[in-house]
């Protein structure tokens, strides 16, 4: 008897849906085993039990069918080829740079760096924390101030945060006026003016010299100016200080290698972009902004701050310091709504400084400056004199034949800054060569000018000429710490990067089940286009006709996201979820204002909301009213209805997350939307949990008016260890006219003249291909299956853990959505073991903790995502069950409450190399289950003392001896 051969069709053999299988973790057999445990026949039957039928979509979303990786990459490559990457001399905060290949391959393209999460669990994040401390030290050294944060979203955002800091700390309390020099980058002015409008601040934009003539609480000055001018502003700063004003300086980081630091000139805060330290322009981002200030203003500093503390062995250890300033704790009273920043890009910039060191940076900066001097001298000898005699890298010329020069430039594949009438500006950078300068002579002067770069260089050397005033030549040392003077060969640099990487736990090691964070697969194919030169090397203000590849990709992605969200229009400008919230709330405010309802300023927020919600509402000057939740964790409908009706005359909106932050599909969500609309408000549906909606329902279908999407959650952009992120917003048509625009690049004719929320017109555009490929590879079926499996995995974990821990909230049929909350409070009551103890103990099992104490104190919120296999889920469940058994030994008295594996966790190699006198074995400490022995992750420090770190704040690199293990 012969077996019948099964013949597949060609369509099946072409594997067009193969990526779905690669992305979704559980195999068919694993899925069936989980369904058996859950008591359902199929994934679809489970979904029917969980998602309310009245909000279910009838059909799959109208996006493309899935593609193979080869096909999707080839198609996107064809789109990218539509971009025309010219030699760029536009400047304005975006410069060509040479990313060292050792950093490109081993950091930007390395999942050990890009798949980690924000270092809330510092014992397993010492590598990137050390690199971020290097970043802070770099910023402190170059700016001449005392304290730095670990990055902000972009230069414009940092400038807006500087304005907010100035208002908080200025002693000129009666003033509501902020001054901006007219030589600040136009996009920065745009972002700051938008923020000021929402804060109710007045703005004056004028020549910097006029600042002291105004009664201001603060001022923003560019150094060097957007025009390239380098000016000694120390006397001006002193005058502003005499009038009790605060001065923020927006500085070019490369120029500070040669120029006197803003701190030495008297600045109170310094902001800027670290992009030109090895991070590609990427059509606007992502890039890490820096923010430094004086120690006395540390409590007002926005963003993450990395500080030095001690672990339980007294060893120096790093952590995020002073978190009580931040939105996840202070909510509406936070300094900023910034949550995720730009950690991956800050680390790239820090490694750039480490690799080149002070001498290497000086060589690069001097080369850029010398080429600018050669260009300036050459043109001057032919009668074309730069407007400013003092500059670093940017020359501005008044020209009568502007159109002719621009035409020659375009013919030579070169872009200049041309937005000022009668002027062109040319900014040189690290990529500029002597051949480029020779070409610039041809463009500016026409052929036959007879200028020779080498001859001009000889003249400059012989004359000792300097276009930097003597009073502004940097004399103070930079980057003196040994870390910036030790790793200048590629061998040493590679090993240093690897040494730091090995200290961190990321998705390349194990599941990270952080609730509300969606730590899913960031597929390698999706990451590849980020470093394609067609995407990486495009200036955000390049002529639009040169960026047709970006336009095509962004337009197609926006169309897909509109379909998946049920909205009518998308804006890609917000470069984080927090920025998306801010932009969406601005749209709501402007909409009410357009209808004569500017008095509508009350925002209802459920008690369970993420801290960014109230912090964002405060940024648009809304008043926050909290809506209660019932004992099931759902919005208390009676309380909502009463407050909406009571506040109807002034109701602006509600901010609500769906599924709820408690991990449940609330069956009343459509009714909630109706109540708000009936009382004149708008519905802001936070997109944090879109991974439980895509393909099954949508915010627009539910009845919401606006949402932001966390592309770094639902749509596969990696978290980068704390950024980058992207937070585009979708809106219904009535809100579309109020989306952000841009000062230099009109995003949409319908939004022309609107303010910006980010420095670049499309935010961090170079990471949008990740989301584009996520959707293209999965297709309509795959993106829907991803949602279904996220729900399936979460319910499997919830069911298994419910046999050992209370599950705090569930929906109908006892099911959860895509995440669940495990209640640990009874264990604390019975044993003294805290959620912190359990989080640290999970490190010994090779896992990052779930989200701790949010949205309910004393709990874990677990979100496994669709990308994890049953094998990995079972490994995590085993760890949690074993930890519960360990707690029982504390409860029974077998282990003392202050001497047990949980209290002493995490355990390090140092612990087991010393005499062992603990009541549990070494094996119980570090190899508690068999699975750990095959893939042991060793924390490099013991538990860190948070209180010591905040009481003894050190946010710069400690002595080199402290790095010795």
UniProtKB/Swiss-Prot annotation:
Q: Which residues cross the membrane?
A: none
Record bears the keyword Oxidoreductase:
yes
Q: Which CDD domains match?
A: GDC-P
Gene3D superfamilies reported for this sequence? Aspartate Aminotransferase, domain 1 (3.90.1150.10), Type I PLP-dependent aspartate aminotransferase-like (Major domain) (3.40.640.10)
Name a GO CC annotation attached to this entry.
glycine cleavage complex
UniProt keyword annotations, A-Z = Oxidoreductase, Pyridoxal phosphate
Q: What is its EC number?
A: 1.4.4.2
Under the GO molecular function aspect, what terms does this record hold? glycine binding; glycine dehydrogenase (decarboxylating) activity; pyridoxal phosphate binding
Cofactor(s) recorded for this entry are: pyridoxal 5'-phosphate
Please list the residues that carry the modification N6-(pyridoxal phosphate)lysine.
713
Catalysed reaction, written as an equation = N(6)-[(R)-lipoyl]-L-lysyl-[glycine-cleavage complex H protein] + glycine + H(+) = N(6)-[(R)-S(8)-aminomethyldihydrolipoyl]-L-lysyl-[glycine-cleavage complex H protein] + CO2
UniProt xrefs under Pfam families: GcvP2_C, GDC-P
Q: Which GO terms describe its biological process?
A: glycine decarboxylation via glycine cleavage system
Name the family: Belongs to the GcvP family.
Which HAMAP family does the record associate with it? GcvP
Report the protein's function.
The glycine cleavage system catalyzes the degradation of glycine. The P protein binds the alpha-amino group of glycine through its pyridoxal phosphate cofactor; CO(2) is released and the remaining methylamine moiety is then transferred to the lipoamide cofactor of the H protein.
- Assembly and interactions? The glycine cleavage system is composed of four proteins: P, T, L and H.
This protein's name: Glycine dehydrogenase (decarboxylating) 1
The scientific name of the source species is Colwellia psychrerythraea (strain 34H / ATCC BAA-681) (Vibrio psychroerythus)
